[in-house]
Amino acid sequence: MKHMWSEEEIQEQASIENLVDSKGRNRFIEIESTPGERDGMQINYGKCVLNGNNLIFEIQGNFTKNIAPDFTLCKFTLPEWIAQKIILGFANVVDLSPYSLISTDGVVETSLYCIYKEGNILNFSQYTGVNAPSLTVFKIRYNLIISK
C-alpha cells in the first residue's frame, strides 16, 4: 500500500530541507558533479548531498574498455565552509576505498578509488586500473561525516 503524505509530514520535510546552522548556512545542500573525461568511461550520475552533518556522495557510471590507473572519475566543488571541515587522512588524501565493477557478462571485479582534496574540490579518482572487456557498470556511495 502506498503511503500518502499528510500536510503535516510535507511541512516537516520542507522544514528539514530549510534547516540552517547558527551562522545561517543551509544544512541541506545538493551539489552536482563534474565528470572526468576519459576515453572508455562515462559518468551517468554524480551528486553530493549535505544533510545535517552527513556529506553523502553517489556516483554511477560505466567503462567500455580496459583503462590504466590514476584518472578522475568526477569532481565535486564544495562551498568553502564545508571544504574547511573535511579532515585529510594523509597528504591531500581524504580516503581510499574499494568498490565493485560488474560487467554485462557477469564478471565482478573489486577496484579502488581515492578521494583527493584540492582546495574546495573533492576529486574522486580511479586508483587502480580497470579491466573492462565488455560494458562494465559501477556505483560508488560514500558518506563523510563533517563537524558542525
Task: Describe the role of every protein-language-model region.
Residues G52-I56, K85-I86:
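Extended extracellular/luminal ectodomain segments enriched in beta-structured repeat modules
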Residues M1-G24:
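Short, low-complexity N-terminal tether/leader segments at secretion or assembly junctions of large
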Residues I10-E12, A83, S125:
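Intrinsically disordered, low-complexity regions enriched in polar/acidic and amide residues
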Residues R25-G52, N62-W81:
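Surface-exposed ligand/attachment interfaces on beta-rich extracellular proteins
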Residues I43, I67-K75, K85-K148:
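Extracellular jelly-roll beta-sandwich "head" domains, especially the C-terminal globular C1q domain
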Residues I56-Q60, S125:
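Beta-strand residues in well-ordered beta-sheet regions across diverse protein folds
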Residues H3, G52-N54, I140, L144:
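N-terminal cationic leader/targeting segments used for protein routing and processing
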